[in-house]
Amino acid sequence: MSRSAIQVAKTATHLPDLVEVQRASFKWFLEKGLIEELENFSPITDYTGKLELHFIGSEYRLKRPRHDVEEAKKRDATFASQMYVTCRLINKETGEIKEQEVFIGELPLMTERGTFIINGAERVIVNQIVRSPGVYFKDEQDKNGRRTYNASVIPNRGAWLKFETDKNDLLHVRVDKTRKINAHVLMRAMGLSDNDVIDKLRHPEYYKKSIEAADEEGISSEDQALLELYKKLRPGEPPSVSGGQQLLQSRFFDPKRYDLGRVGRYKINKKLRLTIPDSVRTLTHEDVLSTIDYLINLELDVGGATLDDIDHLGNRRVRSVGELLQNQVRVGLNRLERIIKERMTVGETDSLTPAQLVNPKPLVAAVKEFFGSSQLSQFMDQTNPLAELTHKRRISALGPGGLTRERAGFAVRDIHPSHYGRLCPIETPEGPNAGLINSLATHARVNDYGFIETPFWKVDKGRVIKEGKPIYLSADLEDECRVAPGDVATDKEGMIVADLIPVRYRQDFEKVPPEQVDYVQLSPVQVISVATSLIPFLEHDDANRALMGSNMQRQAVPLLRPERPLVGTGLETQVARDSGMVPISQVNGTVTYVDANIIVVTDEEGSEHHHSLQKYQRSNQDTCLNQRPIVHNGDPVIIGQVLADGSACEGGEIALGQNVLIAYMPWEGYNYEDAILVSERLVKDDLYTSVHIEKYEIEARQTKLGPEEITREIPNIAEESLGNLDEMGIIRIGAFVESGDILVGKVTPKGESDQPPEEKLLRAIFGEKARDVRDNSLRVPSTERGRVVDVRIYTREQGDELPPGANMVVRVYVAQRRKIQVGDKMAGRHGNKGIISRILPREDMPYLPDGTPVDIVLNPLGVPSRMNVGQVFELLMGWAASNLDCRVKVVPFDEMYGAEKSYQTVTAYLKEAASLPGKEWVYNPEDPGKLLLRDGRTGEPFDQPVAVGYSHFLKLVHLVDDKIHARSTGPYSLVTQQPLGGKAQQGGQRLGEMEVWALEAYGAAYTLQELLTVKSDDMQGRNEALNAIVKGKPIPRPGTPESFKVLMRELQSLGLDIGVYTDEGKEVDLMQDVNPRRSTPSRPTYESLGSDYQED
């Protein structure tokens, strides 16, 4: 399998590190962000000004984490480090200085793979894309259809300032969406004279109307302006000049209350062509005057003033982990500041030390809240390595300070020309989040300001210069250049061949001669995201299907024996490597020891490097993480070489599925509507078998009647059921368990009231004290089975942290091998998905001229209407590759090598395969790409030739085992008394409004009546019905549903006198059948569950 297609060599530029976004951001936080926050925070003075507390941020230090990554996962702990910072307390009266190192909280650390471990679970902080601070100019239409312009100054934090024009050519200003104020009133309040303003404007005649309007209102001095400002901003409070002065100062000129941020200052300077230094983060008079000037130029349409496009990526920036965490630390420190000030006031001035003042709790709480419950801190998707990698590169517009799903319109979700090479136009979810959650393109990176950049080669007089490093441009810099796509054809010297080149210039497409091209894109793949770039022949697929293909690759279950694709795109190796699933050699050297658990590499100096491998660990999604060595003892290795395969990897490449022989033809209706017909070979040879590891947990708690006990002595259980339990009552590792088997024996003490009357009678007669415990053991749920692979016991004595009230926690891990079966979902890489409808014996499958039965039969009607023809190219290229015994890498967008290149390449490969001895039948020029198949049942040929070939097919995580569910009786909701919903709650199937209509339409009155009463929430009726069924009697008449009683009670609680009456006008008492001692329901029929159960 050494050969490779011609197409790979030219375009596969090496991608940058794909998790860099996460790592670089966290590194910035540790080196700069945290220090910045600690230093901005000091000094803190008490209310009298006697004491000052300084934080010396640059001297903070982190202690070694208490647990390493593996230990933290095992113990359900957080992988975090303690933060200490030097504090200086200065007593102004005595001049005394106390310096001390103070503990300020725990900071979760990022693992090498860009994740965090919080309470034992791996989490990812998703990057957020938000509107950049700065100044924005927009136009709106007023009621009369006249265009008005407005300018908004948006800070990083603080009050918004919005300038507007109106039909009378007056300028107004709003602060934080309050009432309109004449703009000149604000100028005068800021202490600017009329001449100061007029000198700065290029067209003062427009502005003079606003000055006149201010004079007419009688606001001619600074004091009057401040009073007016105070009245407008704080209506209802007595205005004062000093109040106005303070209000204006704190709103816009106090660095603690108003901050443009580095980015905001950069954007304002750039838009208004100012040269204010980076360190000035508040508003200046110059900013305000330049904004007004620019707005007037817009209104008069002079001076090259342009409107801003809010969806342009030059106006949206990415907030990664570091910045989100920095904001959170700021919140914690602000809470801390209040506490310190109070303690300074209350404490004895002389004896105070910094350690007494600083309480780590608020900071710890803020950081914990961010990692534990922020919308952007997500449980990592670990289904396979690609899912993990994509999750770390995700960019979300949701979250705190971002958009909400309901508010986001079409414009925000749409693809924008500036996304080109920065955000993937294809990979986004289907449904309500479409366009709000994006994926970073393959070559994109985030710069210091948070803008997304993408790389280009410089073009000089028509020659592409590919020396040195490529040049990275952000969206607004790129607008000023003419950029050609990555697939322009060039000759050996790098000169562009064509006469006219399509280029992008200022959001538009035009054609120019090669001399005018400024930059050319690095590679055709740089437009799309990592998942999309793994789809071969992507350019032949419709975008909607490519989207499904990208998303479904992330749901592929790692198989027992992974197989890398016959037809790939050349990026498989890098995806596997950057996902962190494969161990990589850090040094040049020799492998000196290998076994299943560890690989030792000895470098040239003779020191050993140990790589321990993960064996059968459970991932967040219950799939299996396992690493297998691929080097042997004595092998030489180089830096960056892959030492072992992870899950869903083979030979250091990502391998999400299997290459199987596929035929496109209908077969007895079993592949109608996207269903899939598969051969028994896939089951027998374990091609699509995967390992899943379930975690079961039980805790022994302290109850009012005494402690629960984990034990082997369980009442009323036969000895053979306890055969696999050890002396503590915990299952042994390696035991095979079926549904209903006991995993951990547990007994709970029961009180007097728990005993049924017959037991009380027995005890009264015989006087024996039966053991007062009931069986509360952990059992294997229905439909589950497997082998116990691990048991973990946590107790307080071992120093484990347990939940409150628990004395002991036992966890049992059960692994199961799942073969493929009817009802499982499978998919190709081109969005061609389906459900398995039947598994056919090998001998009944259609077979090739050489007798090979096909593995999968797909419906040919799935291709034309969906326009994902890429699957057909992949099929035939795979067919050629398997016959030539090689693997092929095809880079997407191959038209740069000539028109219809895909077609030509595939045909050439097929012809080459057919030229091999004995393989003439592989390619038939009369019917290219099709073969005459025979029916496996009769041996007769089908009447039409069929497209056959090898395709990479995936088994997705939507397995029928996890979905199939049935219920006879089970838990009911407490208020409505209706059965719960969902498999996890052992719930029933919902009979909704539309289903009721259907039954009504057929007049099926009795069926409907029992569905709405005894099968649902008529409590007495369902008990009686169950009783009647058990005893074989006729089922009695249904009563009143509980939900009707709830409705009555709700209406009565509104004060409405509502009741149910008979024809004779007698009121019916709906509550008569309610047992006065309703606390204990009649036992065996149902159990009610509290409302907390429903929320799950």
From Swiss-Prot:
Catalytic activity reads: RNA(n) + a ribonucleoside 5'-triphosphate = RNA(n+1) + diphosphate
- Record's CDD domains? RNA_pol_B_RPB2
Query: Matching PROSITE patterns, A to Z?
Result: RNA_POL_BETA (PS01166)
Q: What is its EC number?
A: 2.7.7.6
Identify the stretch(es) annotated as Disordered: 1070-1096
What functional role does this protein have?
A: DNA-dependent RNA polymerase catalyzes the transcription of DNA into RNA using the four ribonucleoside triphosphates as substrates.
Name assigned to this protein: DNA-directed RNA polymerase subunit beta
Q: Which organism is it from?
A: Prochlorococcus marinus (strain MIT 9211)
**Taxonomic lineage of this organism?**
Bacteria, Bacillati, Cyanobacteriota, Cyanophyceae, Synechococcales
